Amino acid sequence: MQKKAAVDIGSNSIRSLGPNGERRLITTRLAENIISTGKLSDAAIERSIAALKELAALAAAQGAKPYAYATSAVRDAKFGSRERFLALAGEIMPVRVLSGEEEATFARIGAGIADKPDWGLIDLGGGSCQLISEGFAVSAPMGCVRAKDICDKESDGSYESMREAVFRACEGLFRFPRIRITDWIGVGGTITTLAALSLGLEEYDEHAVESTLLTRERIELLSKKLHEAGDGVRSRHPLLTKRHDVIVPGTLVLLYAMQGMGIRALHPSKADGLDGYYKYICQNM
């Protein structure tokens, strides 16, 4: 049977999961400035196509065929940029554009709660945020990269101004089902990075991260501390090298979603939609 590799074309990064569990991540910021322009920039497309070529070569070296899925940035892009990107990417590997609900479903499968109807999942990416449990799946076009663009354009840089700008932008984008769920899994780089930072880690430790409970109060405190530290300090932190400018905006989106859904705490998980899609292609392709 042909080995397979899954590739996630995200709004902040492009990731791959290989046949032996190997993971790669390349930050490309595909959704950069999409809030103001409505399209994928030429530079972002170029970075992302280069990343796909690199990951395709890696899969080939492992004897695997790569299958990619695209999320919010590609899903929402206009003015021909979506078609241009998909044409270029399709020459490298098959690409499926997921709906927000499909994205949430694969995340739930990947996180291992597909058979846990009483659990909820929040998936915060670069361009969108999904809330999902048994009976509902909600996707809002707001993630850490889009939130950064909003903060750059609509705030004065202070924490309160950034919070106000992000919360204002989130209003009307999120739909919160009237349902009470006690246990929540949190996936996506913003959430797992916050969990690592809450533990004082300077090197990512998957076991430690997935063993912690990330409360809303702790997230709020971290958000303020990260803002107070300044971008220069954040950029020198080993866990924030490529996330230093989106971690605070992304955390504000997370706080808005948790507040709206009444989520008091999250169980962070590294396994997410990429893992779910890998399971899918292994069973169906």
Where are these regions (language model features)?
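Two-metal-ion RNase H-like nuclease active-site motif
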Residues: K3-I9, W119-I122
